[in-house]
UniProtKB/Swiss-Prot annotation:
HAMAP family named in the record: Ribosome_mat_RimM
UniProt xrefs under Pfam families: PRC_RimM, RimM
Name of the molecule in the record: Ribosome maturation factor RimM
Subcellular location: Cytoplasm
Domain of life of the source: Bacteria
Origin organism lineage: Bacteria, Pseudomonadati, Pseudomonadota, Gammaproteobacteria, Pasteurellales
Function of the molecule: An accessory protein needed during the final step in the assembly of 30S ribosomal subunit, possibly for assembly of the head region. Essential for efficient processing of 16S rRNA. May be needed both before and after RbfA during the maturation of 16S rRNA. It has affinity for free ribosomal 30S subunits but not for 70S ribosomes.
Subunit structure: Binds ribosomal protein uS19.
Length: 178
């Protein structure tokens, strides 16, 4: 494993518990289609706070779970050390998106402002609800409406009117009282 100096890594999953005695591990993918995690290579593992590159040797489905074999991880003991470690990939491997489509990591940290100019807060995370994605917006400490958090559906053009990644601003048609 080599250390990754560059810190442009996005978490795409997590290693789970060991499987068998030959170093296999379960994985939990946070990509839209679970097996899409294998489209993004190379992988980096966050070990003791540092990203280290690792080579994927093999993967397969086993009882509706995905298990992986990593190069150099050849027994249960070596695999146990990696249990629950985050899997990341360099952002440069992600494809360019069409206008109106955004990666969640681009939206997190953006300031949300409604059409009246009221600053509603900052996007802290995204949620997938099945029908649409939702912005989780942490309200400012002195929010005039007493809100701590707002959940705003990411419906482009309906609710989300403009996203400016240069200024990290999202303009929404949303009542500040909600």
């Amino acid at each position: 494993m080599k250390n990754m100096e560059q810190q442009h890594i996005e978490v795409v999953g997590k290693l789970g518990s060991t499987y068998g005695i030959r170093g296999w591990l379960r994985i939990y993918s946070s990509t839209e289609q679970a097996e899409s995690i294998f489209d993004y290579q190379p992988w980096f593992l966050k070990i003791k706070g540092e990203w280290q590159s690792i080579e994927l040797e093999n993967w397969r489905y086993h009882n509706h779970e995905i298990i992986v074999k990593l190069k150099g991880v050849d027994d249960r003991e070596a695999a146990q050390i990696l249990a629950n470690v985050e899997i990341g990939v360099d952002l440069s491997v992600f494809p360019e998106l069409e206008e109106g489509d955004y990666y969640w990591h681009d939206l997190i940290g953006c300031t949300v402002v409604n059409l009246e100019g009221y600053t509603m807060g900052t996007v802290t995370e995204m949620m997938e609800t099945g029908s649409n994605d939702v912005l989780v917006v942490k309200a400012n400490t002195k929010d005039a409406f007493g809100k701590q958090e707002r959940l705003i559906p990411f419906l482009y053009e309906q609710v989300v009117k403009r996203v400016d990644l240069t200024t990290k601003t999202i303009e929404v048609d949303w009542d500040a009282g909600f």
